[in-house]
Amino acid sequence: MHGNRRPEVTYPDTYHVTHYGESSKMIHLCHRIKKMADDIDGKLPEEAKASYYGLVYYPAVAGANVQLMNLYAAKNQFYAKYGVAAAKDYAEKVKQCITYDEELTNYYNKEMADGKWDGMMLSAHIGFTHWNDEDWKYPETVQGAVSDEDKLLVHAADSDCFVSEGEVSLPEFTSVGEETYLLQAANAKDALLDVILTCEDDFVSIRELSCGPQSVRNFEVSVDFSKLTETKESEILVQAASCEVKVKVKAVVITEKLPSMTFVERDGIVSMEAEHFAANESKDGKEWKCLKEYGKTLSSMKVYPMGTNFDKPGEGPSLSYSVLIREGGEYTLRVITAPTNSLEDGRNMRYAVSFDDGSASEVKTVLDERYNIGGGHSRARDWAEGVLNNCHYGETKVTLDKGVHTIHIYSMESGLVLQKLVLSHEGDAKESYFGPTESGVVR
């Protein structure tokens, strides 16, 4: 979790509050970490508990609590902006996190090991605004207005707002993706809303989830592709409090016969975890190997044994990724790497990329003029941002026709760690911290 973003430089806008469900996923992760830490603590003998608290429990749980503080603040601000009564619930959750942070820190200083390490956790660890803790601050909350009357407010997954009328669309469903999306029916009044959801097509499934504040009802929408032979569009009608909103559903049936490990474009995006390659080609005894559970989402790939640079694009060991492009046009390939530095002084971190049978071109994870280990001139901000984000990006523009294409990633600089690839149609990428959820893939 701390490898995603350090707690002291996490803010309400770090993780996107709606896109790709990443704030909700982070909230779930924080609660899971807290439960794991509590479970282990309950199994330890008394003589081991002080060491466990100082070395494991406090870093994990206090860090997760700071993350939650910011995630709840983001929910509060978003709900308040659109008049959702649940904004006040999340403002209260932020207050609870602040109180819990004080309790955890006080226990570390005053009670753990009979106060042996008193003062060790007095330094600020929330909301840094500079490189140090000067002018640190708690995340801000908004005391949104709560209506006296029921009012339906609908939010569809990945959208940027709640609406009380008109139409919204869920992201596409694909026959290879097993996607499920969240549909929320919220109330401007602090009360449970009597909501009616109807859909005339039996291939659309709607299931209510038992989670969230009382003024927000959460529904999981999925598609049963066993009932479809071709791409279909449908509509969910959401009705409550004399309001109605139409929710568009598109179920895409992939009819092409595709090679194994081919990713399918969805809403103009193909997102691929690095370990899900179609081919792994070694060179001179060097090959890409998987680093399990290292990286922002799933894992990472790195060339071993280390120590060899390949200065000519395309001559190093390679990973290949197969993609189905459903709409031809201009695309951007973003390659997400760990924020590693070159193992040799004076060199930048590089890889090479080619498409299909085209020639390979060199890509740097940070432009030379913006690469400066240890900080320095403001032009080095890209490198510095990579430290905070714990990743660097390389981007390549390409024109692709409709159909199946192969992306080849070649090693150039020893030590490069590949985490994720995102191919996006021009204008279709949404703002997010982790990037899009992995696309559906043929296995």
Residue ranges and their predicted role:
Residues M1-R5, V84-E92, K116-N132, L237-V245, ...:
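A broadly tuned preference for mixed-charge, low-complexity surface segments
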Residues H19, L44-A48, E273:
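General structural signal for secondary-structure boundaries
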Residues M1-K35, D39:
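Long, charge-rich alpha-helical interaction segments
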Residues H2, H16-H19, H28-H31, H125, ...:
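Histidine (H) residue identity feature
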Residues S164-E167, S175-R443:
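Extracytoplasmic
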Residues H16, A48, L55, A80, ...:
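Generic signal for short, ordered secondary-structure residues
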Residues S24-Q184, E235-I236:
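Histidine-centered catalytic/metal-binding microenvironments
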